[in-house]
Regions:
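Conserved SAM-binding loop
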Residues: 13, 86, 103-106, 138, ...
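Active-site neighborhood of HAD-like aspartate-dependent phosphohydrolases
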Residues: 1-42
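Helix-loop "lid/cap" segments that line or gate small-molecule binding pockets
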Residues: 25-28, 47-62, 117, 150
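Short, acidic loop-to-helix structural element flanking the phosphoryl-transfer center
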Residues: 78-105, 111-115
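Metal-dependent phosphoesterase signature
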Residues: 34, 54-92
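Conserved phosphate-coupling serine/threonine residues in phosphotransfer and NTP-handling enzymes
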Residues: 12, 107-109, 184
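Asp-based, Mg2+/Mn2+-dependent phosphohydrolase catalytic module
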Residues: 1-3, 95, 111-214
């Protein structure tokens, strides 16, 4: 019996991976760092603490990690204020699921980005709890952010369903002992063997209905 549905944000509700990628690339290039071919995929699911350290340590950005994070986040927020890149069908899916279960959100995005995205989408009132990876010890694929969401909602992980798109996100939900519904990221598709561990694999978020969880 699923009592709570915990959504990821980037790639599930908001098509923002390209904006994060663009903003990080700009900071690397403008400060004299060097972008690596595997950088985008390596940072999927990382918390802000982790990816800002990655830009500093691996990509050679000569700024303190806190400043790197603040600079990237401000650029992403500026894009959101111009136009929030919602995944088609995301708002309707959130509203459908809110009629069936309590909702939470567990994201690698920074707190200001989470709050802005949900407010601009006008669904912030539907989520009981939202957790940023910067508020826990470890980012995805560690289970911390999902376990913290369950703790704040006062529910057992066993009655939670996770809605995820990325390999690290799926691993995080599975490690938390939760039911995972995968909507594979079309740009960085999770490996087939990992998708087989999900309770359901959907083509798009339009396919997410309460019946999927029964």
């Amino acid at each position: 019996m699923i009592d709570a549905v915990i959504f990821d944000l980037d790639g599930v509700l908001v098509d923002s991976e390209s904006l994060w990628d663009q903003s990080r690339r700009e900071v690397v290039e403008e400060t004299g760092g060097r972008w690596l071919p595997d950088a985008t995929e390596a940072m999927l699911g990382m918390s802000s603490t982790e990816w800002s350290a990655f830009l500093h340590d691996r990509l050679g950005v000569p700024l303190p990690p806190d400043e790197i994070s603040d600079t990237v986040v401000e650029r992403v927020l500026a894009h959101y204020r111009e136009r929030l890149p919602l995944v088609p069908g995301a708002v309707a899916a959130v509203r459908r699921m809110a009629e069936r279960a309590r909702l939470g959100l567990a994201s690698s995005a920074n707190r200001p980005v989470i709050d802005a995205a949900l407010a601009l989408a006008e669904v912030d009132n539907l989520f009981e709890v939202t957790v940023s990876s910067e508020e826990v010890a470890r980012g995805k694929p560690a289970p911390d952010v999902y376990l913290e969401a369950a703790r704040r909602m006062a529910v057992s992980p066993a009655v939670c369903a996770v809605i995820e798109d990325s390999a690290n996100g799926i691993r995080s939900g599975l490690a938390a002992g939760m039911t995972v519904v995968a909507i594979p990221n079309p740009h960085f598709a999770p490996p087939p063997e990992l998708l087989r561990s999900a309770a359901a694999v959907l083509s798009t978020i339009d396919d997410l209905t309460p019946e999927v969880l029964t």
